Amino acid sequence: MNTTANLGKAPVRTLVLQLAIPSMTAQFVNVLYSIIDRMYIGHISENGALALAGAGICGPIVTLLTSFGTLVGIGGSITMGIRMGEKNHKKAEQVLANSFLMLSIFSVLLTVSFLLLKDKLLMLFGASGATFPFANTYLTIYTTGTFFALMATGLNYFINCQGFPLVGMFTVLIGAGCNILSDPIFIFGFHMGISGAAIATVISQILSCIFAMTFLLGKKVPVKITFGQYNLKVIRKILSLGFSPFLILATDSLILIFMNTVLQKYGGASQGDMLITCATIAQSYLLLITSPMIGISGGTQAILSYNYGARCVNRVKDAERNILGVMLIFTTIMFLLSRFIPRYFVLLFTTDPQYIRFSVWVIRTYTLMIIPLSFQYVFVDGLTALECPKTGLALSVTRKTLCVISAAVLPSFFGAKAAFFAEPVADGISSVLSTIVFLLLINRHLDKRCRMDKKESL
């Protein structure tokens, strides 16, 4: 697929597969940044377990940083997709210009803020005296590359929404390939330990950023990066549409941070660091599922927003059905694999029998409700793509609130291990709620869009 015109003409099922497969592949590969780092870190001689726990504490903070790229990328690409569906090239160009400006501003603000506050944040978010040096080293180096991380993440959405999913996938593959090759060189070859892991990640993000910017400044894309046409109304529109997916990622990070503090509190000095290490391994596995899920639901938003802008209601409905079908197939496969292969995954990080046994249990617990979670992802992202960000936001907040309450309450009655049941409890309840809300709203919302068309034609 080479142009946005295909988004309004090609068979819907073909479009969904053309966008979903490269996007989910890109997200899957993108997860390798953190997993490969953690895999090598876990095998550092003498202090691998402590270094892995330190990296685990940094993980949610790193995700929180890059989620600002998602905020602008998804909000901007949805807005731009609607404008392209309306055949308004000038407005689409303005959206990209304002998005680039916001990515630049967020990069500067986040870099300065996190460098100033990182020591206090790490201790607040679960670092112990033993793990703090490792977490501090990793986060300091990573934060200096915030600009490249946000640009690589945010700009890739604008590549995908213009009908270039394979290019978007290649943007991620460049960074991941570099990370895979450079990690062992910096960590073990140069004997840099956890510092080497962070440096390798930053270099990888620089390469992805350069590729994405070069493509969006080139001749192949219909809508290029320009400078000027800055408008507060456009910025507010982008932020409103991007806030729901941003909240999903940002609060995922905050929940992981909260989980680390709960595990440290209830695990105590004897088990706290061990529980966090096992949670880090299990969370790495979970990312192999949830990141491609984001790729499926987020990567196909361009189909929904373009046809919504063009007022092709039947294509919107058909797209949602096909997106949900792809998602259910993926989550069913991953649920089954989660029953049989966790041990082999855990062995990539550690050979300690106690860590292996408990990490496997956590993985199986985390993934209990992964199939119903398909409905939550597809319907929340679908509502956002159809200019219903407040509804999507409310559903996202509900899931996160349920997770926090469960993580806070369950350990006080059943011990530290009970905190791991917070995820499936929240996933199950929120998925049912999201399905009900979506089915009640979707037809009325699309009918309203059609009536707007008739009024405007008068």
Stretches with model-predicted labels:
Residues M1-S23, M80-F147, G189-F243, L304-M369, ...:
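Short alpha-helical transmembrane segments in multi-pass integral membrane proteins
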Residues R13-L32, I36, I61-F68, T144, ...:
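Residue-level signal for short hydrophobic patches within transmembrane helices
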Residues L52-V112, A149-G168, C278-L336, F340-P342, ...:
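Small-residue-rich hydrophobic transmembrane alpha-helices
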Residues Y142-N160, G168-N179, A197-A212, M293-S297, ...:
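Short runs within selected transmembrane alpha-helices of multi-pass transporters and secretion channels
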Residues I21, D37, G76, L117-K118, ...:
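Hydrophobic/aromatic residues in alpha-helical transmembrane segments
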Residues Q18-D37, I141, G175, S204-S208, ...:
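Transmembrane helical elements of multi-pass membrane transporters/channels
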Residues L17, L32-Y33, V72, S113-L117, ...:
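Residue-level signal for transmembrane alpha-helical positions in Major Facilitator Superfamily
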Residues F28, L32-A53, L122-G129, I185-H191, ...:
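Helix-terminus/linker motif at the lipid-water interface of multi-pass membrane proteins
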